[in-house]
Each structure stands twice: as C-alpha cells, then as structure tokens.
Design a protein with these regions (language model features):
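C-terminal cap/substrate-recognition subdomain and adjoining C-terminal extension
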Residues: 2, 83-212
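Active-site neighborhood of HAD-like aspartate-dependent phosphohydrolases
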Residues: 1-50
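Metal-dependent phosphoesterase signature
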Residues: 56-92
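Glycine-rich adenosine-cofactor-binding loop
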Residues: 53
Length: 212
C-alpha cells in the first residue's frame, strides 16, 4: 500500500491567498482600465449573492485579470507569477516535502487554485503529483475544464486518483490551513492544521503546526 503526504497550497505552503495576490500583482488599476475594475466588482457581488458558483466566478475573475494586465503574453504572465509564488513558500514546508520524498512517500499538491501557475510550482517543489482545478484555453479565454478542487470536490478528486484500498491512510499525512478541508483531514491518520490557531482549537484531534 502507498504512503502519501498531501499539502494544500494557499495559506499552507504560502501565507496568503494566491488568487488575491494574482489580482494585486497583475490587475491594472489605471483610469483606462476602470471598466474592467467595475465589471470585476459586479462579478464579485454576483458571487457573494450566490448568483455565480465559485467555479463560475473563478473563471470570470481569472479572465478579467488577464485582460487587464499590462503583461500581454499569457505564458510569460503565469511563468512570472509561478516564480513570484515559489519565492513565498515557507522554508519549513520545503523541508517537509524533501523529508517525505526521502522516506518513500508520494507527495501530492492538492489545491483549489488553478493549474495555470501550480504546474510550475509543483515541479519546482518536486511534488510527485498535482491535483488542482484544471483549465483549458478555448476561443482566447481561460475556461475551467474540471471540477473546482474545493471542499468535498478535493476529497472526490483525491480518491479518484488514490483509491481507498491503495493507500495506507493511517500512515499518511495531510497538511492544510483551511476549515473547508476538515473532511479531507479526517481521511488521514496524521492530519495537520498549518498556521490556523482558531481552527486548531476547535479541532484538538488534529495536530496544529506553525510553519515559517
């Protein structure tokens, strides 16, 4: 049976949310781009009013930022963003990934964030596999081509690749900061909450760790 070590990305391997960082780094806040900014506010309101699903909003959000960016080469944009995020990864996390690989674990990056930048990050950190929200480029726009890898979908997508009878769950590890991953943590014999003291206090059965 396989031993696996699963890592979330946003808030776990890096301190902040990568989708917010994507906006801050690439959205052009000039007067010329005001129509796109207004549209982004409108799309965000529709999401919070539950007119859009998280998957629909994510797709619109990504496309609006790409359209407004001063960096017009799509491939160059995501290459730059991957490099930027890699520099933010906690040193503790990097050591853990290396340690698990040395001990024969299959290391998995499991995230709701898109493959647009996670592919390069996953390779850069030496992960065995990436399971995330998948995208395709169709008619000059990015579309989400898989399930949104969030909440219960994370569990579904993980178990799709790693059948329950194939994995030594009791000996395997999971690291996340997100309360939406509570069900995911319950699969593992070694569940860890990263850098979220409040979540840890509510769930004393999970081990809390601080990564820097």
């Amino acid at each position: 049976m396989e031993l696996i070590a699963v890592f979330d990305f946003d808030g776990t391997l890096i301190k902040k949310d990568s989708m917010i960082l994507f906006f801050l780094r690439y959205f052009d806040l000039s007067i010329k781009n005001l129509p796109n900014f207004c549209r982004l506010i409108l799309e965000t309101l529709k999401y919070f009013l539950k007119i859009y699903s998280q998957k629909q909003f994510k797709e619109k959000y990504i496309n609006l930022i790409i359209a407004s960016s001063r960096l017009k080469d799509r491939e160059a944009l995501f290459k730059d963003f991957s490099k930027y995020l890699l520099e933010m990864v906690f040193k503790t996390a990097k050591k853990k990934i290396i340690e698990f690989k040395k001990n024969g674990y299959k290391t998995i990056l499991l995230s709701a964030s898109p493959d647009l930048y996670l592919e390069k990050i996953s390779k850069g950190l030496g992960f065995s596999e990436l399971i995330c929200t998948r995208t395709a480029y169709i008619d000059n726009r990015t579309v989400i081509s898989s399930l949104n890898c969030y909440g219960n979908n994370k569990i579904k997508m993980l178990l799709n690749k790693y059948k329950e009878d194939r994995v030594d769950w009791e000996g395997s590890y999971c690291y996340t900061d997100s309360q939406s991953d509570r069900g995911l943590l319950n699969l593992f014999g070694n569940p860890h909450i990263v850098n979220n003291i409040r979540f840890g206090k509510k769930n004393p059965d999970f081990k809390s760790v601080i990564w820097k």
